[in-house]
Regions:
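Conserved AMP-binding/adenylation subdomain of ANL enzymes
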Residues: 1-3, 11-53, 66
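Helix N-cap/beta->alpha junction signal
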Residues: 33, 56, 86, 165-166, ...
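Short hydrophobic/charged patches on amphipathic alpha-helices used for structural packing
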Residues: 38-41, 71, 229
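AMP-binding/adenylate-forming catalytic core of the ANL superfamily
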Residues: 52, 111, 160, 165-166, ...
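Active-site phosphate/pyrophosphate- and oxyanion-stabilizing loops and adjacent acidic/basic residues
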Residues: 61, 95-96, 230, 274
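Short Gly/Pro-enriched turn/cap motifs at secondary-structure boundaries
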Residues: 130-137, 182, 188-189
Length: 330
């Protein structure tokens, strides 16, 4: 009998699916009332948990940082796997898990409430090279459609949207307009296509790029915040980050990064730009920087992009606004 410790709140679909799955096979589940990194590790030790489930960097980063605290000497030998879903789980944070727990397996899963589980990747130490997003093996049903609702050819590099057929919802309750947008029919078959952009690799695996509703359009180029966030968060002086689009007269939008610094001194825009150029394409590098005391996220750990857009709207140009410091280069 295996023991699962899901950390995301019960309101989150991934937690619900994990608990139901464990129950169906007779495994044991431990619930934690509130996310507190050291309490998680204490429970793993005392309950001999074999697997924990998190929501990306929002939970992963505090967990690995807790293991670096003085006196953090936990017996985690029972832990076999760390599973993440619903939010970006960046390569640097995965590497930190492997530094502390070299024998675990990391499972990166993608999906949505509208489609269920679309795929997963099983990662071991040394296999965390930074990519645009997770590259997962398809679990049957998902395809990637282009703008004309034609299947994207594997290995073509064409960006499309993930769509899934099979056991999918009828629609959104009392929202026929949104239902018609997301639940589509192609060649007589119903699909759920909530808006996740992806490419198909030559071997048939899918690389998730991000949700189209939060993508940035700069000079006609589509930029997915998740890739930029992964690069910014990996900066040693950054604890957390959210990336959104800011209005730009020339390009339509420019990349704006909102960061929560690790210490009292925040990195400058120049420092962030110089660092990011080693990890992402030049046109994706942030052109505007906001520094805040705390990055806001939903209870499930997902980035609060509405809050982030409000931060950018309040301080659109280079200025000093107390709680949020902004710099921009145009």
């Amino acid at each position: 009998q295996l023991t699962l410790l899901p950390i995301a709140p019960l309101m989150h679909g991934a937690t619900q699916w994990s608990i139901l799955g464990q129950s169906l096979v007779g495994n044991r589940t431990i619930l934690i009332p509130k996310f507190e990194p050291h309490e998680v590790w204490r429970l793993v030790e005392s309950e001999k948990a074999n697997s924990i489930m998190i929501t990306g960097d929002a939970m992963g980063k505090p967990l690995v940082e807790a293991l670096d605290d003085p006196g953090a000497d936990y017996d985690l030998s029972s832990l076999l796997a760390v599973t993440s879903s619903a939010a970006l789980f960046s390569a640097p944070v995965k590497d930190e898990f492997f530094r502390h727990l070299p024998n675990i397996v990391i499972v990166d899963a993608i999906g949505s409430s509208e489609s269920g589980n679309n795929g997963m990747a099983t990662i071991t130490k040394g296999d965390t090279a930074m990519k645009s997003g997770p590259t997962v093996s398809v679990l049957g049903g998902p395809v990637v459609f282009d703008e004309d609702l034609k299947p994207v050819a594997p290995g073509s590099g064409t960006i499309g949207k993930i769509a899934r057929t099979g056991n999918i919802p009828v629609g959104y309750y009392n929202d026929p307009v949104k239902s018609a947008e997301v639940f589509i029919t192609v060649d007589g078959k119903r699909y759920s296509m909530p808006g996740d952009f992806a490419t198909i690799e030559a071997d048939g695996t899918i690389t998730l790029l991000g949700r189209g509703s939060v993508s940035i359009n700069s000079g006609g180029e589509k930029i997915f915040p998740e890739e930029v966030e992964s690069a910014v968060r990996s900066h040693p002086a950054v604890l957390d980050a959210i990336v959104v689009g800011a209005p730009d007269e020339r390009w339509g939008q420019r990349v704006a990064a909102i960061i929560q610094p690790r210490g009292e001194v925040a990195p400058s825009l120049d420092e962030i730009q110089e660092y990011c150029r080693d990890h992402i394409a030049g046109y994706k590098v942030p052109r505007q920087l906001h520094v805040v005391e705390l990055i806001e996220r939903s209870p499930s750990g997902k980035p609060d992009y509405r809050w982030a857009n409000n931060i950018v709207a309040e301080v659109p140009e280079a200025s000093d606004s107390g709680g949020a410091r902004t710099a921009s280069d145009s």
